[in-house]
């Protein structure tokens, strides 16, 4: 088992890691939040993986393989977990925190494909094809991230029927999420985009550990949607008035997930 700080793993990449732009659009900037307290020691790797539904379905010898070859990293907001156009050396999961998958151009302007909250795993498509990663993976908030090496992933795919079944469902659900994200970004107004971005983070098929509450600030949500914190606040206030969610400090409680997922769909 290996436990490291996120910045210590720069040697995995052919060029130094750099903090990623945290906003997709110039108007998304906001005053920095208070820094979080220093993280405590991480639990054993077996405890972290034991909370993953796919891991619990594996045979004991396959679980042992994962634990022997995988590792965990503690990452801070702004850390680049994986670079675009670097080899897809790992299948990546979020034990705790929030990541975003995005592309940035040379001027720093970007496009976010998806947010990945606690319990989410991603990158299986590129890992299966052993291709270069197609997007940057950036921590939006302090995150505990799990890494399964590409060779371990393929060994499981070749020998574990439960794992193969999980990956098939994962690919299917991820494709649906990306199609919906493109549709929403091009055809919905801002309020509906905020609602749909939130609803995606509560998708139990992809993110089973989210639960009814999500620890996220309005600034962090703005990084996912690509609009300013002030505009996010307006949209959230409207959704709260409709009874779809309840707001607290750096937390969103979903009261009616169906209503949240339906919001703005009449625009299509």
Map each language-model feature to its residues:
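Positively charged, low-complexity/disordered segments
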Residues: 1-14
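Cyclic nucleotide-binding regulatory module and flanking cytosolic helices
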Residues: 18-77, 126-127
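Cyclic-nucleotide recognition modules
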Residues: 62, 68, 113-176
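Short aromatic/basic micro-patch
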Residues: 91, 115, 147, 215, ...
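Polybasic "coupling" helices that flank or enter modular domains
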Residues: 140, 158-226
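Phosphate-/nucleic-acid-contacting segments
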Residues: 201-268
